[in-house]
Amino acid sequence: MEKGYSKWRKLDNAALAFPLVTDKNDTRVFRFYCQLKEDVNSAVLQLALDQTMEKYPLFQAVLRKGLFWFYLEHRDIRAVVKPETEPPCSRLYIPDKKSLLFQASYDKNRINFEVFHALTDGTGAMHFLQELVQDYLILAHPQADLPQIEHAEEITHGDKEEDSFSQYYSSDIPKDKEKKKAAVKLKGEKLVHSDMHITEV
């Protein structure tokens, strides 16, 4: 594991609820994907994932339950690319199962990245997918002289382990008294057990 990272870390405050409320009907998994102009080469995608994981060592972790809190523990488990066979956002975290909390998969010309929400938020997942796709395209087209992804700021080890909720939240800040508009409620027949249904357009 890259120097500068601990072998375990507590979940930040914003992520603590996810392990408690997840089940087979509410997986707390979300997905980003990138659609290419060509079919995905699975062998090249695996090499790209290996490279990307070197930049994201915190993702090589399993979720464990301690006496007082959940925590992420580093494990030498290789992330393996798979063809897409399961429904989108299928369950990734199963209590007491020592498995990674994300999955990279592919289907025809699409690269999928699914992640359990306790591991990272949308920003972290988007950065990971950007790196993965960049590494894939560079490996697949070595003569193309493709541009590198430019991030606004270089992310340090401390930034990746930072609990932003604790750093920026304060109960002393007065709440906004402005009346909020009612949320939009979707119409239609509900699925049995509140199962998820996904429609792509």
Where on the chain are the PLM-derived regions?
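Non-catalytic N-terminal regions of enzymes
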Residues: M1-Q167
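Flexible, P/S/T/G-rich "lid" or insertion loops adjacent to the active sites of thioester-utilizing
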Residues: F165-V201
